[in-house]
Amino acid sequence: MIKKYFFSFFAFLFLLVGCSNEEVNIVKKHEVIEIGIVGEIPSLIKENNIKFKKIMLQDLHKKNEDPFDAIMITKDYLQEASDKQYTQFYLNSSIPIVFVQSDKAISAFIIPNHTYENTFENQAQDYFIGYYQGTTFGVALNGNTNEDLIKGYWSLFDLLDRLKQTNN
């Protein structure tokens, strides 16, 4: 009898949570993560511990990246970001470089003479791909809803937070 009530309670709870129309609110506890971003700041990320600061692609190799925990380059700037003048910056950066919504593989950005046009497709179809001190990484989305996008950003922020902790 107790098992029946126990099962019914959890089935009801599961249905109640599954049918919610509430806005996704994923609360994570991170230290402050500061990201230099080339492109638009994501409007879905509103937490106070995630700080974005707009930067210009042309200024990447002129700037000291120390104030940032990572640099993000959004889809509209990927073709230009694959120019060989930036390759050494990505390879030598002391912080992770993240490319958002790239249709191409990471090699477009980190291998000299590869460009966005002549590099093969991103077969993994990761939403975020990146490079950090000899390591490439990717974060995929589980779907194409705002909730999936927010969860993808949080997976990326978790990764960046771990990299930050490892580097300190």
Map each language-model feature to its residues.
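Residues that mark the start of a beta-strand
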Residues: 26-27, 31-37
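C-terminal motif of bacterial Sec signal peptides marking the signal peptidase cleavage site
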Residues: 15-18
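Bacterial signal peptide processing site
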Residues: 20-22
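Extracytoplasmic electrostatic interaction patches
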Residues: 42, 84-168
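Positively charged n-region of N-terminal signal peptides that target proteins for export
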Residues: 1-5
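Short, well-ordered secondary-structure micro-motifs within conserved domains or adaptor modules
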Residues: 64-79
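Conserved beta-strand segments of the P-loop GTPase G domain that flank and frequently precede/overlap
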Residues: 37-38, 71-75, 98-101
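A short, well-structured beta->alpha microelement
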Residues: 37-67
